[in-house]
Amino acid sequence: YEDVEIFRLEKTVNTLPYSKSLTDLWDLYDLLLKEKKDRSPLKLDFPERVISTDVDDSVLDITNVKKNNSNQLVEELMILANISAAETIKKCGMGNLFRIHPTPSNEKIETFRNIRGAGSSITKNGNKITSVHLNEFVNSAKGVDEREIYKQEIIKLLEQARYSTKNDGHFGLNLKSYTHFTSPIRRYADIIIHLSLIHISEPTRLRRISYAV
């Protein structure tokens, strides 16, 4: 990640393998960030933390992991791959396991409305709420401490993401179709996505794989 970040900042040519591909990826990254800004997914930005211990496993320090644009590039590409996988399987008319994130329930929304300042961030047309409203709510916080409190309240509001054969979209990412093709934790549901794509592209290979599964 560090080498790729240096490549991005210094625009050094041919200092890394696949320099041309990296240049193209950074151009794509700019487009993905623009699309992300227009889409306005939920932005909570909880830091990833690392715990340092001594030989006796006593905690010495807890530090935040510093992420750069290279980390975010990979994250955006993973999201794009997951969208593409979901759309590809859907277009082929096959059954699919979508990774859905339901809109918060009416009961949770009513509770959330009573939080200081939250009411102005929610549309007045019924109980409809979007990631845009929640982002506005977080941004309305006065100071870091209040911002963290608001983010914790949003966590309580959100439903749990799950797998479903019904495509109900992903509330947090503000996407119409999403699945777990690039999930770092390989649940069997994720394997099904891979098998479905193999069935589309290489059906004979799927038969060989089936014997080993």
Predicted regions, residues:
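Hydrophobic alpha-helical segments, chiefly the membrane-spanning helices
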Residues: I209-V213
